[in-house]
From Swiss-Prot:
This protein's name: Leucine-rich repeat-containing protein 4B
PROSITE patterns: IG_LIKE, LRR
Record domain LRRCT: where: 313-365
Annotated LRRNT domain residues: 50-88
SMART domains noted in UniProt: IG (SM00409), IGc2 (SM00408), LRR_TYP (SM00369), LRRCT (SM00082), LRRNT (SM00013)
Top-level lineage group: Eukaryota
GO BP: positive regulation of synapse assembly; regulation of postsynaptic density assembly; regulation of presynapse assembly; synaptic membrane adhesion
Spans traversing the lipid bilayer: 575-595
Complex and partners: Interacts with PTPRF. Interacts with DLG4.
Entry keyword set: Cell membrane, Cell projection, Disulfide bond, Glycoprotein, Immunoglobulin domain, Leucine-rich repeat, Membrane, Phosphoprotein, Repeat, Signal, Synapse, Transmembrane, Transmembrane helix
Main location: membrane
Domain statement: The extreme C-terminus binds to the first 2 PDZ domains of DLG4.
Taxonomic lineage: Eukaryota, Metazoa, Chordata, Craniata, Vertebrata
Length: 709
C-alpha cells in the first residue's frame, strides 16, 4: 500500500536504504494530510487562480464567516474601505451599514465565485469603472440607500449573469439612454424612491429584453415613461407618483404584464382604452387615488383580469359607474363588497358599487356629436371615418361591411380604431367599399350611425385624376363631404395671332397642397350629410379663358414627378448645349478654311502672266496707205467720241492682225473704266486727236502681238 502511494507522490523515488531525512518527512506529510491530497482545502491552488493574492486561510477580523468562509458578513463595522482579505471562495458578501464612499477598480477581482454582493446603506457616491471586474458569477447587486447621483452604467460591464439590481433611494437625477444595456440579463430592477429624479430618456430601458420586475414607485413621475422595450415585463410598480391622467398607449408593448400597482398615485382620470395593451393583466390595484368614474367597458379587453382593487376613491355613483357594478358582479360574484364604496351623491354614500343596479338611476343613451359621413376616395389613399361623442365615459366600436366588429386594439393590417373612436384606414383598397356602422355604448344603451365608403380604382391612363377630371364630373373622387388629397394645377396655353408678337406665358397657378373637398366638383351625392358641408373648402379659382386646361394630380406624386421632370429637363439642356458647341466649332473651322482658300486664290491671281500693251508708231509697221486710213478713222472717232458710242473704223488688215481686235477692245475697256456710254476720247484725252498713226501691241512679255488701229 505504501508503495502505491509513493507512486502517486510528486517526489521521485529513491532506492531503499538511501532515502534521506527530508524526503521521509515529506512522505509522512503527504500520507497524513488527506485534505491536501484530495484538494479539499484547495487554498493554495485557489489563490493562484485569484490573481496571485495571498491565500486567505481565515476570515477577516472585521467580519464573520460561515460555511467554510463562503458566507462573509461585515455589517455595521464602520468600514471606510472594502476589506482586502476576503476569502476567494466567498459566495455571499454583506457590507451593509458601513461608511464606504468609493468602490475602486478591481476591488472584488479575486472573488470569482461571488454571487450576492450587498453594499446598501453606505455612503457610496462614486463607483469607478471596472469596480466589479472579475465577478462572472455575480447574481445580485444591492446599492440602495446610498449617495449615487448617476447610474453607474460603465461599472456594470462584464456582469454577464447579473439578475437583480437594486438602486432604490439614491439621489439620482436622470436616467440616460441605454443606461442598463450592458446588463441584458437583468430580471429585477429596483429604481424606487428616486425622489430627485427629473428626467427619464425615451431609450432608458432599451436592451432589457429579459426584465420581469420594475419598480418606479415614489419617483415623482408625472407621466408614465416609455416602457415599450420591456416586452417580457410581468410586474410594474408605479405607486406613490403624481400620475393625474392615464392616457391610451401608456402601456404599449407590455403584453406580458401580469401585475400593475398604481396605489397612492393621485390618478384622477383614466381615458378610454388606456389598458387595452395589457392583454395578460391579472391584478390591477387602483386604490387610494382620486377616481370618480371609469370609462364604459374599461376592463372588457382584459380577459385575464381576476383581481381589481378600487377602494379609497371618491366614487361618484351615477350612470357612468353602472357598468362597473355589472362587471364586478360577473367577475367576483361571491363578494361584491370587496372593492369600492360610493362617495356621492349623499343618498348613496357608503353603498358598495357592486350592489348598485339600474333602478337607482335614470340613464339615457349616448349622443353622437360628430357622426361619420359618406366618403369617396381613390384606391391607395388614406381615409378616416369619425365618430365622436361628448364624453369619454362611453365605448366606441365599428361594424365593417363583412360583419367584423372592430374595437380599439383590434389588430388589422390597414384598419384600426383610434382612441377617440375614429376608424382609420392607412391604405384603402376597392374591397374596403361598403357601409360602416359606428356604435357608441353606455350603461343605458347604444347609438349607431352609418356611413358609406366608396373606393374607386386608379385610372392607369390618368393616374391620380378625379374620375371625370373636371367640374361636374362623376368620377371616383366626387362626393360631398369626402376629402381627396389632390392638388389642382392650371396650365395656360397661349395662341399667337398672325402679325402679333408672342407674349410671355403667365406663371402656372397652384392650389396649396392639402385636402380639397370633392363636393366642389359637383359630382357628389345630393343626400350627403350636412356636417360635411361645413368642413369643406372651395377649390382655387381658375381663369375662364378657353385656352386654359386644368389637370388634377395627387400630391403624393408631385415630388416624385417633379424630380423626374427636372432630370429630363437637365438632360435636354445638356444635349442642346452640346449641339450648340459642336455647331460653333464646325463654323469656326469652315471660316478658317474659307479664309485660307481665298488667300491662296488671291496669291495665285497676283502671280499670273502679266499682260502688256505697247503703243508703237504705225509708220514703222504699215505702208503709207494704211497709215492714212488709220489716221482718217482716228479723226472720225475724235469727232464722235463726245456724243455717242465710239467706234474705231479699222482698215482692212491682214488676217493675223484682225484676230486680236476683240482682245484689244476688252483690254482697253478694263484699263479705262469700261464705260459704255462715253467715248474713248472722254477717258483718254490723248486720243482726242491723232497726229500720227499708232499701233497697239498686246500680249505677254514673251510674245507681243501687233494690232493696227
Amino acid at each position: 500500500m505504501a508503495q502505491a502511494h509513493i507512486r502517486g507522490s510528486p517526489c521521485p523515488l529513491l532506492p531503499p536504504g538511501r532515502m534521506s531525512w527530508p524526503h521521509g518527512a515529506l512522505l509522512l506529510l503527504w500520507l497524513f494530510s488527506p485534505p491536501l491530497r484530495a484538494g479539499g482545502g484547495g487554498v493554495a491552488v485557489t489563490s493562484a487562480a485569484g490573481g496571485g493574492s495571498p491565500p486567505a486561510t481565515s476570515c477577516p477580523a472585521a467580519c464573520s464567516c460561515s460555511n467554510q468562509a463562503s458566507r462573509v458578513i461585515c455589517t455595521r463595522r464602520e468600514l471606510a474601505e472594502v476589506p482586502a482579505s476576503i476569502p476567494v471562495n466567498t459566495r455571499y458578501l454583506n457590507l451593509q451599514e458601513n461608511s464606504i464612499q468609493v468602490i475602486r477598480t478591481d476591488t472584488f477581482k479575486h472573488l470569482r465565485h461571488l454571487e450576492i454582493l450587498q453594499l446598501s446603506k453606505n455612503l457610496v457616491r462614486k463607483i469607478e469603472v471596472g469596480a466589479f471586474n472579475g465577478l462572472p458569477s455575480l447574481n445580485t447587486l444591492e446599492l440602495f440607500d446610498n449617495r449615487l447621483t448617476t447610474v453607474p452604467t460603465q461599472a456594470f460591464e462584464y456582469l454577464s449573469k447579473l439578475r437583480e439590481l437594486w438602486l432604490r433611494n439614491n439621489p439620482i437625477e436622470s436616467i440616460p439612454s441605454y443606461a442598463f444595456n450592458r446588463v441584458p440579463s437583468l430580471r429585477r430592477l429596483d429604481l424606487g424612491e428616486l425622489k430627485r429624479l427629473e428626467y427619464i430618456s425615451e431609450a432608458a430601458f432599451e436592451g432589457l429584453v429579459n426584465l420581469r420586475y420594475l419598480n418606479l414607485g415614489m419617483c415623482n413621475l408625472k407621466d408614465i415613461p416609455n416602457l415599450t422595450a420591456l416586452v417580457r415585463l410581468e410586474e410594474l410598480e408605479l405607486s406613490g407618483n403624481r400620475l393625474d391622467l392615464i392616457r391610451p398607449g401608456s402601456f404599449q408593448g407590455l403584453t406580458s404584464l401580469r401585475k400593475l400597482w398604481l396605489m397612492h398615485a393621485q390618478v384622477a382620470t383614466i381615458e378610454r382604452n388606456a389598458f387595452d395593451d395589457l392583454k395578460s393583466l391579472e391584478e390591477l390595484n387602483l386604490s387610494h387615488n382620486n377616481l370618480m368614474s371609469l370609462p364604459h367597458d374599461l376592463f372588457t379587453p382584459l380577459h385575464r383580469l381576476e383581481r381589481v382593487h378600487l377602494n379609497h376613491n371618491p366614487w361618484h355613483c351615477n350612470c357612468d359607474v353602472l357598468w362597473l357594478s355589472w362587471w364586478l358582479k360577473e367577475t367576483v360574484p361571491s363578494n361584491t363588497t370587496c372593492c369600492a364604496r360610493c362617495h356621492a351623491p349623499a343618498g348613496l354614500k357608503g353603498r358598495y358599487i357592486g350592489e348598485l343596479d339600474q333602478s337607482h338611476f335614470t340613464c339615457y343613451a349616448p349622443v353622437i356629436v360628430e357622426p361619420p359621413t359618406d366618403l369617396n376616395v381613390t384606391e391607395g389613399m388614406a381615409a378616416e371615418l369619425k365618430c365622436r361623442t361628448g364624453t369619454s365615459m362611453t365605448s366606441v366600436n365599428w361594424l365593417t361591411p363583412n360583419g367584423t366588429l372592430m374595437t380599439h386594439g383590434s389588430y388589422r393590417v390597414r384598419i384600426s380604431v383610434l382612441h377617440d373612436g375614429t376608424l382609420n384606414f392607412t391604405n384603402v383598397t376597392v374591397q374596403d367599399t361598403g357601409q360602416y356602422t359606428c356604435m357608441v355604448t353606455n350603461s343605458a344603451g347604444n347609438t349607431t350611425a352609418s356611413a358609406t365608403l366608396n373606393v374607386s380604382a386608379v385610372d392607369p391612363v390618368a393616374a391620380g385624376g378625379p374620375g371625370g377630371g373636371g367640374p361636374g364630373g362623376g368620377g371616383g373622387a366626387g362626393g360631398a363631404g369626402g376629402y381627396t388629397y389632390f392638388t389642382t394645377v392650371t396650365v395656360e396655353t397661349l395662341e399667337t395671332q398672325p402679325g402679333e408678337e408672342a407674349q410671355q406665358p403667365r406663371g402656372t397657378e397652384k392650389e396649396p397642397p392639402g385636402p380639397t373637398t370633392d363636393g366642389a366638383w359637383g359630382g357628389g351625392r345630393p343626400d350627403a350629410a350636412a356636417p360635411a358641408s361645413a368642413s369643406t373648402t372651395a377649390p382655387a379659382p381658375r381663369s375662364s379663358r378657353p385656352t386654359e386646361k386644368a389637370f388634377t394630380v395627387p400630391i403624393t406624386d408631385v415630388t416624385e414627378n417633379a424630380l423626374k421632370d427636372l432630370d429630363d429637363v437637365m438632360k435636354t439642356t445638356k444635349i442642346i448645349i452640346g449641339c450648340f458647341v459642336a455647331i460653333t466649332f464646325m463654323a469656326a473651322v469652315m471660316l478658317v478654311a474659307f479664309y485660307k482658300l481665298r488667300k491662296q486664290h488671291q496669291l495665285h491671281k497676283h502671280h499670273g502672266p502679266t499682260r502688256t500693251v505697247e503703243i508703237i508708231n504705225v509708220e514703222d509697221e504699215l505702208p503709207a496707205a494704211s497709215a492714212v486710213s488709220v489716221a482718217a478713222a482716228a479723226a472720225v472717232a475724235g469727232g464722235a467720241g463726245v456724243g455717242g458710242d465710239s467706234h474705231l473704223a479699222l482698215p482692212a488688215l491682214e488676217r493675223d492682225h484682225l484676230n486680236h481686235h476683240h482682245y484689244v477692245a476688252a483690254a482697253f475697256k478694263a484699263h479705262y473704266g469700261g464705260n459704255p456710254g462715253g467715248g474713248c476720247g472722254a477717258k483718254g484725252p490723248g486720243l482726242n486727236s491723232i497726229h500720227e498713226p499708232l499701233l497697239f501691241k498686246s500680249g505677254s512679255k514673251e510674245n507681243v502681238q501687233e494690232t493696227q488701229i
